């Protein structure tokens, strides 16, 4: 994997920085593990915008990724590493000994030909998936389940990981990348190591058009709008917002907590916020 600063042949390429991985598969993805997905452009079933700044972009196939890793005791060989347009991490196509192929999130250091295993008897090696009760305390993990059998939901993006801090009864404590410490049932599964493509955050897209390829539309500032459109809008000429930053609906925009899921609050041992 290499970081390439593009030659400034145009204003759009002057600031562009790419992450190039020559180990990625250059051909088409595995067709049996593809699914079609239609773009909603941020609209709901009534056609109204529910998520702003979405629309357009290149059409993509969804790669069906195995987040459960339940084929216990069956060794799998990594056939190839692939780019996935739906996530920041790369994915790996693995071939199980029984002939089945599946996509998984590619951990850091994974190579073509490497053997992987899942289940309680799997060795503690990067890419192997085990129940948390079988993972030593202090191990770096990723792709962590929040409920047993539901599939990995935490620590899935490029370069992320978590650390197993302790086990107490039927729960374990896991420190996430944000600093949050969370309780997870020991029967939940996690994968050893950290997610690969850790240099993803160093890329510079260079031009607005690259965001349009990704289906991201422009974000208009509130102070550039009219009062009917935004609390920051209006005024003669260029003016400041005149109040603390808020969303178009008046919700504080800087540091205001919006989490409302009280049902799982008891699973959070330490919040990620400093205050």
UniProtKB/Swiss-Prot annotation:
SMART domains assigned to the protein according to its UniProt record, in alphabetical order: Ribosomal_L2, Ribosomal_L2_C
PROSITE patterns: RIBOSOMAL_L2
Biased composition (Basic residues): 50-59
Gene Ontology MF term list: rRNA binding; structural constituent of ribosome; transferase activity
TM helices/strands, residue ranges: none
A Gene Ontology cellular-component term: large ribosomal subunit
Keyword terms: Ribonucleoprotein, Ribosomal protein, RNA-binding, rRNA-binding
Stretch list, region Disordered: 35-59, 224-275
GO biological process, one term: cytoplasmic translation
Coiled-coil annotated residue ranges, if any: none
InterPro entries: NA-bd_OB-fold, Rib_uL2_dom2, Ribosomal_uL2, Ribosomal_uL2_bac/org-type, Ribosomal_uL2_C, Ribosomal_uL2_CS, Ribosomal_uL2_dom3, Ribosomal_uL2_RNA-bd_dom
Polar residues bias locations: 35-49
Self-association and partners: Part of the 50S ribosomal subunit. Forms a bridge to the 30S subunit in the 70S ribosome.
Function: One of the primary rRNA binding proteins. Required for association of the 30S and 50S subunits to form the 70S ribosome, for tRNA binding and peptide bond formation. It has been suggested to have peptidyltransferase activity; this is somewhat controversial. Makes several contacts with the 16S rRNA in the 70S ribosome.
Family: Belongs to the universal ribosomal protein uL2 family.
PANTHER family assigned: LARGE RIBOSOMAL SUBUNIT PROTEIN UL2M, RIBOSOMAL PROTEIN L2
Record-given protein name: Large ribosomal subunit protein uL2
